[in-house]
Regions:
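Glycine/Thr-rich phosphate-binding loops that ligate phosphate moieties of nucleotide
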Residues: 1-160
Length: 160
């Protein structure tokens, strides 16, 4: 997958409704679907499209958050953050630097911190090299296609 994320520059758009369409839509789509002009997409192209769909859903949520507050950078952690390609796409689409923590079990760490009573002396996690936004017009075009297709199928996202 990491190599595919570097090599594939024009994957199809994937409407990711696996398990239901999450925030900010919170509704069902009929079926997850790849939007492409042909049925010749490779497994690699479909895998990259799935990763991009995650980035697109994150971006949609970021845009809604930024209606209420300013965000200057993103910090990511956990399993999927191990994918450099995902982090770079998120930086390029959001226009913000992305910093990744060296913590593949961020959810478990967060639960442990809460269970410990939120101690102020909790050990910090080291940051790994980050990702700066780079111009990626095709990615932004696929994002627009993704949003337009979701709005056509589901309507506007739920109100803030």
């Amino acid at each position: 997958l990491p190599v595919w994320l570097q090599q594939i520059t024009d994957p199809p758009v994937f409407l990711n409704s696996v398990g239901g369409l999450g925030s900010p839509w919170w509704r069902q789509l009929p079926e997850p679907v790849f939007l492409s002009g042909d049925n010749q997409t490779s497994q690699a192209e479909r895998a990259v499209a799935v990763v991009e769909s995650i980035v697109f859903l994150l971006q949609c949520n970021l845009e809604r958050i930024m209606r209420q507050t300013t965000i200057n950078q993103l910090r990511v952690s956990g399993g999927l953050s191990r994918l450099d390609g995902l982090c770079q796409k998120l930086a390029s689409l959001s226009g913000m630097p992305v910093t990744r923590h060296d913590d593949s079990e961020a959810s478990a760490r967060g639960v442990a911190w809460l269970a410990a009573g939120r101690p102020t002396d909790w050990p910090a996690v080291d940051d790994l090299p980050g990702f700066l936004p780079i111009p990626d017009i095709p990615l932004k075009n696929r994002y627009r296609h993704f949003i337009e297709a979701l709005q056509t199928q589901t309507g506007e996202p739920d109100a803030d």
